[in-house]
């Protein structure tokens, strides 16, 4: 799966995913966004959880997306980002 496939799948399912898991998908970042992924790369997805979302929601969305994208997925909460990492993440971010 490449960057365009990931963007397509996330875009197609965005509305239903956001309702089901109480979040907003912001985009992908990291090696897939840059186009320098390897077989061992995971897909980094930046999200913003809504009030009422739980740790279980975060685990569930990760499992669901790993199944749908057929790859390891790293769900990163925008609120949990460390300030020193934000410039690097936002530089690579491809909005969905």
Regions found by a protein language model. Give the residues of each.
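Catalytic core of pol beta-like nucleotidyltransferases
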Residues: 1-25, 33-39, 49-96
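Conserved histidines in hydrophobic membrane contexts and catalytic metal-binding motifs
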Residues: 28
């Amino acid at each position: 799966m490449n960057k365009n496939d990931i963007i397509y799948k996330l875009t197609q399912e965005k509305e239903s995913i956001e309702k089901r898991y109480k979040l907003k998908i912001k985009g992908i970042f990291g090696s897939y966004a840059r186009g320098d992924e390897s077989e061992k790369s995971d897909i980094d997805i930046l999200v913003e959880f809504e009030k009422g979302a739980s740790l279980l929601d975060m685990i569930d969305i990760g499992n669901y997306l790993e199944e749908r994208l057929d790859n390891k997925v790293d769900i990163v909460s925008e609120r949990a980002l460390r300030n020193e990492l934000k410039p690097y993440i936002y530089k690579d971010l491809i909005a969905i």
